[in-house]
């Protein structure tokens, strides 16, 4: 079909990517290298290796990318307080650039001339993967099977798998009715009853978190320490980035934190309903904004809030490797040098409540000035009169004009 000789496939070992593996060999008569990323999705990855071996694959990559994922992708994003359309914490979006990066690296290591993914032609992930590929390797060949083949239903995929002797455990029954994606930051659910925007999902859908109703009746307090805008410890215990996010996930899940049910605007033009569990990320966002509230000056904080929606949109749409995202990241990171201190939070039945924040060396909160008691001349209230009159000048002129 083309002169493609070797393809690096993002491989999960599931139905879709197993069919893709066989289809690539059949259609392109090429060698396939499989790549499976451990991003903390909580799945056993050895079955993916065994399935690849059963296909006779000679080069199999299973990489533990959890620390890199949190350190180099999740934490930089949270320095920006990024939220897409007011609710989505970008758990799927932020994982794609790392997968694309590693695929390109493996292509270079193995001499592959193409990469392939299992994203459908209707979703955002095809865009995110491929913008990543081209942003890192401009001349790479990309194969997107869902845009080429006629296997456009689950029934056709199963028939193809059966025809070619592809083993798909549990393919006939017992599986989830939802399309799910998980990593250390979140788990997402789409499809099934969620395609009706009025129908509430069943409680059994949620895999990570307790319902707020079933969460403990007693609140739990935790302290999160930040250095340079990144969290470094929980309750005084220093943790690696991945271990810290995992701990926050456990704490948030126990207290029913981090569930959302939203309809979002996909980059490809349609609206899509999704449910997400992001327990650790929800806690982290609240804590980060709290430490910024005492360490960032007003204009820096407001500037960050102005650029954040565009930054979040870039990540959602797949432009992590773009020059504009990198420029915005440099601006954001420059604001974080003095974002140091500790935030105390109360977790209770789905709520994350900030109850304290402290920074020994970088706080801009001056109690002697802000107090309602006698400030001993630290703030001259008479100064406010001229400030108000100057700022009111344009309003008075406009009113006189009528």
UniProtKB/Swiss-Prot annotation:
Protein encoded by which gene: argG
NCBIfam families: argG, PRK00509.1
BP term (GO), one: urea cycle
PANTHER family to which the protein is assigned, alphabetical: ARGININOSUCCINATE SYNTHASE
Subcellular localization, as worded in the UniProt entry: Cytoplasm
Highest classification ranks of the organism: Bacteria, Pseudomonadati, Pseudomonadota, Gammaproteobacteria, Chromatiales
UniProt protein name: Argininosuccinate synthase
UniProt catalytic activity: L-citrulline + L-aspartate + ATP = 2-(N(omega)-L-arginino)succinate + AMP + diphosphate + H(+)
Keywords: Amino-acid biosynthesis, Arginine biosynthesis, ATP-binding, Cytoplasm, Ligase, Nucleotide-binding
Disulfide links within the chain: none
Oligomeric form and interacting partners: Homotetramer.
